[in-house]
Swiss-Prot record:
Subcellular location: Mitochondrion
Gene: YMF31
Protein name, as recorded: Uncharacterized mitochondrial protein ymf31
Domain of life, per lineage: Eukaryota
Native source organism of the sequence: Marchantia polymorpha
GO CC field: mitochondrion
Chief location of this protein within or outside the cell: mitochondrion
Taxonomic lineage of the native organism: Eukaryota, Viridiplantae, Streptophyta, Embryophyta, Marchantiophyta
Keywords associated with the record: Mitochondrion
Length: 61
């Protein structure tokens, strides 16, 4: 699962997001399957692993 946090909204998706035609996700490869925020990337232990910003384009209609 890939957890994305945007503002106060939390959404979870499988990493096969191609199943959603409206989902366009651009994430830093260094983040792997970590937790993503709008400006900072964290791994599954909450450790900051890469600076932002994470680009979310047409993510929620």
């Amino acid at each position: 699962m890939v957890n994305l946090t945007v503002g106060n909204k939390n959404k979870s998706f499988t990493d096969q997001v191609g199943g959603f035609e409206w989902a366009r996700i651009q994430l830093p490869e260094s983040c792997g399957n970590g937790i993503f925020c709008t400006n900072t990337c964290y791994n599954n232990k909450g450790k900051r692993v890469a600076p932002g910003p994470v680009k979310l384009k047409h993510f929620w209609p």
